[in-house]
Amino acid sequence: MKVAVLGAGAWGTALAGHLAARHDTLLWARDAALIAGLQARHENSRYLDGIALPDALRYDADLGAALAHGAADDALCVIAAPVAGLRTLCHAMRDAGCVPAHVVWVCKGFEADTHLLPHQVIAAELPEQQSNGVLSGPSFAREVGQSLPVALTVASVSAECRERTLAAFHHGAMRIYTGDDVVGVEVGGAVKNVLAIATGISDGLGLGLNARAALITRGLAEMSRLGVALGGRAETFTGLTGLGDLILTATGDLSRNRTVGLQLAAGRTLNDILGALGHVAEGVRCAQAVLALARAQSIDMPITQAVCGVLFDGIAPRDAVSGLLRRDARAE
């Protein structure tokens, strides 16, 4: 199978390395200097340093060439751009005059200005593209790059997209499950990042494992309430792309969103944290969108509201936690 991966950040690079072990894989980035470095060293020293990439993996800064590779009859196109760049990439794909027949995306979050999920952005920008889906689940790029075991879910209303994605990714240490709840999978992948900031704050304040467990459990309830209101199915949120991804992102030390919370608890400013991080922390980008959607649906999301208060309203982390503890008692 031919596979084109659009986006050479940490996640796109790790997935391309996995795919290249079995398939004819081309990794694209618009940054010619990044591509030149990949071609010279077979390592993404900018986003995934220390991980050797397969010799068979090819690289290109020409989007047209990458799209042609991913548009072959036996091909799959993987969009690994962040949500913030998804619409721009779709514009570029359309302008290139080559939209692959089968597309799967791996970005997580809501578009900041519109509060749209990735599938809604793609439907608006590439309406002719019908065989598409989302690949998501509990996964750190570095561990995938190290070929450590991982389980992911592809969700699509297209059986052909599910089967093609399964054929592309299900090998080696990667196990793929299939489903059709695109909305549920995307909401889980977005909201868990916000909740991971909350658990990072709690851990950074030294509030203990009991508090962490409470935040994860009640955070899952928030995720499920919003997801069902937006059209997802409740059972999706107890699976890999909901609870599984939440546990990993909230507790794993490789989590950028958890790191943001830890650093906020230590008294650092958000600008300083993001500047030092050097990578996208999607929880920061989409927290306000999550809260706005919850309010539009009249859904109570107190943990998400507390995170937004710390991120954007100058509320001290410890005061935000105190506010959660002072909430009126209620039935679970």
From Swiss-Prot:
Entry-linked InterPro entries: 6-PGluconate_DH-like_C_sf (IPR008927), 6PGD_dom2 (IPR013328), G3P_DH_NAD-dep (IPR006168), G3P_DH_NAD-dep_C (IPR006109), G3P_DH_NAD-dep_N (IPR011128), NAD(P)-bd_dom_sf (IPR036291)
Gene Ontology biological process terms in this record: carbohydrate metabolic process; glycerol-3-phosphate biosynthetic process; glycerol-3-phosphate catabolic process; glycerophospholipid metabolic process; phospholipid biosynthetic process
SUPFAM superfamilies: 6-phosphogluconate dehydrogenase C-terminal domain-like (SSF48179), NAD(P)-binding Rossmann-fold domains (SSF51735)
Catalytic activity line of the entry: sn-glycerol 3-phosphate + NAD(+) = dihydroxyacetone phosphate + NADH + H(+); sn-glycerol 3-phosphate + NADP(+) = dihydroxyacetone phosphate + NADPH + H(+)
Annotated EC: 1.1.1.94
Record-listed sn-glycerol 3-phosphate binding positions: 108, 137, 139, 192, 245, 255-257
Pfam families xref list: NAD_Gly3P_dh_C (PF07479), NAD_Gly3P_dh_N (PF01210)
Keyword field contains Transferase: no
GO cellular component, one term: cytosol
Positions of NADPH binding: 11, 30, 108, 141, 256, 280, 282
Single GO term (MF): glycerol-3-phosphate dehydrogenase [NAD(P)+] activity
Location of the active site: 192 (proton acceptor)
Pathway the protein contributes to: Membrane lipid metabolism; glycerophospholipid metabolism
Subcellular localization, as worded in the UniProt entry: Cytoplasm
Keywords linked to the UniProt accession: Cytoplasm, Lipid biosynthesis, Lipid metabolism, NAD, NADP, Nucleotide-binding, Oxidoreductase, Phospholipid biosynthesis, Phospholipid metabolism
Top class in the EC scheme: oxidoreductase
Biological role: Catalyzes the reduction of the glycolytic intermediate dihydroxyacetone phosphate (DHAP) to sn-glycerol 3-phosphate (G3P), the key precursor for phospholipid synthesis.
Family to which the UniProt record says this protein belongs: Belongs to the NAD-dependent glycerol-3-phosphate dehydrogenase family.
NCBIfam families according to UniProt: PRK00094.1-2, PRK00094.1-4
Name under which the protein is recorded: Glycerol-3-phosphate dehydrogenase [NAD(P)+]
Organism: Burkholderia cenocepacia (strain HI2424)
